[in-house]
Swiss-Prot record:
CDD domains: F-box_AtFBW1-like
UniProt organism field: Arabidopsis thaliana (Mouse-ear cress)
Protein name: Putative F-box protein At5g51000
Pfam families membership: F-box (PF00646), FBA_1 (PF07734)
SUPFAM superfamilies attached to this UniProt entry: F-box domain, Galactose oxidase, central domain
Domain of life: Eukaryota
Chain ranges of the F-box domain: 1-47
């Protein structure tokens, strides 16, 4: 009698290539041969390349992390977005999320243990719990939850692909690094300019974290990076525009290869989006991606933008802002060239699409194969 182990390798690979990412973990347990094949680099590259035709994003829906699949152009008429839920983390309530190379760093909403962190790999269903140092992570009333840490957490990796977590408090000028390999926190000595304020706009790209920062004396914004190999902040890098603290500046990534920045001036009816043509720790070059004239008919002035995505192929951007009237739902729009403008009601889509006020970050996974780094401790 034949068994699954007797199947030809090509046939097994074809079978596994048709399995959705969210079901792959269960399938791997079927037999050792299937488990070994799923870990093969050539297979994962081909398999996840097929899965990446749609943009995958993380949304915080009713304090739960949901893995969503977004298609900005189902049809040929530029953009016909759809959205569906393909995964959900139900066990915990989440305050904030930070994405790094396929892994998610979650800060939990737990009054009894208010500094608990979880790292989640939604593709493999793996989780890892991390406890910050109690004596250093001071808590102060802030925002929606008064147990939120005064500092912030960010994740990246060094030149050896070893993942790390950065915690720092701008208020107290304190910095710590958590090393996944050693499972330990270390206090680091980092010199930062007292006149610089680091904004909450931040993204991970190629292992480093990039921030929007403000120079108080010069009254201008700039790009700042943190290098997890050297465990130091990089030099100030220019943005492709001059802005003040009242203007809207958002960061995003494109295919995990480039940075994108959105700029809306507080006193002008115009929005611009730029994409990097070169990005390193000490140099950045920008190219204009999209210009939106908000004086045109049917256009709209955005009051509280929270995130955006770009689709280079269709030359469109998806932006979202908090609904001021309800302070709960998010309004989403598709913007394009020549005055293209369309409002999208994601609440009509299937799946978990009710977005609460804490949903402030979206991450794009397009053409690049996600790194399937393991979260669990050895």
């Amino acid at each position: 009698m034949s068994t699954m182990s007797d199947l030809f390798p090509d046939l097994v690979e074809e079978i596994l290539s048709r399995v959705p990412i969210t079901s792959l973990k269960a399938v791997k347990l079927t037999c050792k041969q299937w488990n070994d094949l799923s870990k093969d680099s050539s297979f994962t590259k081909n398999h996840y390349g097929k899965e990446a035709k749609e943009i995958q994003v993380i949304m915080i829906c009713d304090l739960k992390a949901c893995l969503m699949s977004v298609n900005l152009h189902n049809h040929k008429d530029l953009a016909d977005p759809s959205i569906k839920q393909i995964g959900k983390l139900n066990q915990v309530e989440i305050d904030s999320v930070f994405h790094c190379d396929g892994l998610l760093l979650l800060l939990l909403c737990n009054p009894k243990d208010n500094s608990k962190l979880m790292v989640w790999n939604p593709y493999l269903g793996q989780t890892r719990w991390i406890q910050p140092r109690n004596n250093s992570h001071k808590h102060r009333p802030a925002g929606r939850f008064n147990h939120r840490p005064a500092g912030r957490f960010y994740m990246g990796y060094d030149s050896n692909n070893n993942h790390k977590i950065l915690w720092f408090s701008s208020m107290y000028r304190e910095y710590e690094i958590y090393d996944f390999k050693s499972d330990a926190w270390t206090v680091i000595d980092v010199n930062t300019d007292q006149d610089h304020i680091i904004d909450n706009q931040r993204v991970s790209l190629k292992g480093n974290v990039y921030f929007i920062a403000h120079d108080i004396l010069k009254e201008e914004a700039f790009l700042l990076s943190f290098d997890f190999t050297c465990e130091r902040f990089g030099p100030s890098l220019p943005l492709p525009f001059h802005c003040c603290h009242e203007d809207t500046v958002l960061l995003s990534t494109v295919r995990e290869e480039q940075l994108a920045v959105l700029f809306q001036k507080s006193d002008a009816y115009e929005m611009g989006i730029w994409i990097t043509t070169k990005i390193e720790l000490n140099i950045v070059l920008w190219s204009k991606f999209l210009k939106v004239d908000m004086t045109l008919p049917n256009s709209y002035w955005f009051e509280d933008l929270s995130f955006f995505l770009v689709d280079e192929k269709k030359k469109v951007a998806m932006v979202s802002e908090l609904d001021i009237e309800t302070c709960k739902n998010y309004k989403t729009y598709i913007l394009g060239e020549n005055g293209y403008y369309r409002e999208v009601d994601l609440r009509k889509s299937k799946g978990c699409v009710y977005l609460c006020v804490l949903m402030f970050q979206v991450w794009c996974k397009s053409s690049k194969v996600p790194v399937l780094a393991r979260c669990e401790r050895k």
